[in-house]
UniProtKB/Swiss-Prot annotation:
GO terms for biological process: ribosome biogenesis. GTP 2 binds at residues 216-223, 263-267, 328-331. NCBIfam families: GTPase_EngA, small_GTP. GTP 1 binds at residues 9-16, 57-61, 119-122. It comes from Vibrio campbellii (strain ATCC BAA-1116). This is GTPase Der. GO terms for molecular function: ATP hydrolysis activity; GTP binding; ribosome binding. GTPase that plays an essential role in the late steps of ribosome biogenesis. It holds the Pfam family KH_dom-like. Residues 3-167, 210-383 form the EngA-type G domain.
């Protein structure tokens, strides 16, 4: 399972700065669900190339009028409950405050790993700034400068070590972190996608069942659809106890293909299927998306598409998951309403025009069977092996139809392309000055690859890599005859100027 890290602390200690650095965003609007997570923001983060985790930015706790306990309950208690580890941030420049002491007292009462993080230690005597915080009775404290990334990597390695066997925190004998490497911004961190890695990923996926996550807002019909897919007799068998943030993983088979259904709503016994109130856990949904191959987003046809729907869809896209859309409760709507719903879908979901849309009734089973045709199509598109020669040929066709633009008087040259990964499919394009390609041309290439490869139901990513120039930064060494010619020319110029 993907670990969850919660950032807790009073206002202005740098929680949002650290959140933005971890999620590699600028505005912290990664998955801000209106109404449900008013005081908490959720984002995807990654340490290195393989270690993914979810980070929660909680609202600040000031501990004034109503008391810190009330504020904690309102803004951060739910986030702490959802988290696997808590990072308690304090301000090294401001020093210890009563609010910090109250928060620390609360964290000591819960059975949850909590780490004290002293932020804003850049440009000051860090040890002196941290001295007061030892009063909080902590065993260790960690010094960082979130604005510059100093100490963040080492902090994460320590925080996530219990969840990843290959992570070892870099510590000295007295427990202080020595590694102060920077957690780089996304534009500086260029991932190296190789054909060997892509082939290994392809082979791994061949032996795995398709993991299908059914997600959506509360009461759109996820439970009804899950029960319809599994069959009523399966519900009792798989009515397993789970926590508020753990989904239920249900193995199943359909059309000779093995699946693992990730149920975020929770499969209920027959007597409880008609419950009208469904608890919505954001973390549970985001974890399911991270772990899935294909995401089935359920939308209520009787309600307008909400910002929550778009946030869930955006999170699935950012995670690179294949997507199928199911518009539920379609039965009983008159034709005029149906036309209006379709127009609204076209207007608001144009950015996922590659995803199949199905109009279904989970309650009566109408259209449910066809969902799996699109699920298999999307998964096949995301995991089909494509050779280097085919990708390079498609790239050449694209450049023949529409040449890359000129940059600083030079034409950008695309040389060859190869596969860089699957689920989602990644195409790596090598060339010179490719980082100067405008976004419009990148979109053109992406759409050209999608159309040529007939990719449906999954996002496609293009990674551009500059080919190394073997003569870059090397002085041009003249031959003996060239040196003599140069001297004659210089002598002639001097004589002419006399």
């Amino acid at each position: 399972m993907v670990p969850v890290v919660a950032l807790v602390g009073r206002p202005n200690v740098g929680k949002s700065t650290l959140f933005n650095r971890l999620t590699r965003t600028r505005d912290a609007l990664v998955a801000d669900f209106p109404g449900l997570t008013r005081d908490r923001k959720y984002g995807q983060a990654r340490l290195g190339e393989e270690h993914e985790f979810i980070v929660i930015d909680t609202g600040g706790i000031d501990g004034t009028e109503e008391g810190v306990e009330t504020k904690m309950a309102e803004q951060s208690l739910a986030a702490i409950d959802e988290a696997d580890v808590v990072l308690f941030l304090v301000d090294g420049r401001a020093g210890l405050t009563p609010s910090d002491e109250a928060i620390a007292a609360h964290l000591r009462k819960i059975e949850k790993p909590a780490m004290l993080v002293v932020n804003k230690i850049d440009g000051i005597d860090a040890d002196a700034a941290c001295a007061d915080f030892w009063q909080l009775g902590v065993d260790d404290m960690y010094q960082i400068a979130a604005a510059h990334g100093r100490g963040v990597t080492a902090l994460l390695e320590r925080a996530l070590a219990p969840f990843f066997d290959d992570l070892l925190a870099s510590e000295s004998e007295d427990g202080e972190i020595e590694d102060l490497t920077e957690f780089e911004d996304e534009e500086l961190a260029v991932e190296d996608y190789t054909e060997e890695d892509a082939e290994a990923e392809f082979k791994r996926l061949q032996d795995q069942p398709i993991k299908l996550a059914i997600i959506g807002r509360p009461n759109v019909g996820k439970s009804t659809l899950t029960n319809r897919i599994l069959g009523e007799e399966r519900v009792v068998v798989y009515d397993m106890p789970g926590t508020t943030r753990d989904s239920i993983y249900i193995p199943m088979e359909r059309d000779g293909r093995e699946y693992v259904l990730i149920d975020t709503a929770g499969v209920r016994r027959r007597g409880r299927i008609n419950e009208t109130v469904e608890k919505f856990s954001v973390v549970k949904t985001l974890k399911a998306v991270e772990d899935a191959n294909v995401v089935l987003l359920v939308i209520d046809a009787r309600e307008n598409i909400s910002d929550q729907d778009l946030s869930l869809l955006g999170f699935a896209l950012n995670a690179g998951r294949s997507i199928v859309l199911a518009v539920n409760k379609w039965d009983g709507l008159d034709n005029e309403v149906k036309e209006n719903v379709k127009k609204e879908l076209d207007r608001r979901l144009g950015f996922v025009d590659f995803a199949r849309i199905h109009f279904i009734s989970a309650l009566h089973g109408t259209g449910v069977g066809h969902l799996f045709e699109s699920i298999q199509e999307a998964y096949k598109s995301a995991t089909t092996r494509v050779g280097t020669s085919v990708l390079t040929r498609i790239m050449k066709m694209a450049t023949d139809d529409h040449q890359p633009p000129m940059v600083r008087g030079r034409r950008i040259k695309l040389k060859y392309a190869h596969a860089g990964g699957y689920n989602p499919p990644i195409v790596v394009v090598h060339g010179n000055m490719v980082r100067d390609l405008p976004d419009s041309y990148k979109r053109y290439l992406m759409n050209y690859f999608r159309k040529s490869l007939e990719i449906m139901g999954t996002p496609i990513r293009i990674n551009f890599q500059n080919s190394d120039n073997p003569y870059e930064n090397r002085t041009n060494k003249l031959t003996l005859s060239q040196e003599r010619k140069r001297k004659r020319m210089m002598s002639a110029v001097k004589n002419r100027n006399k």
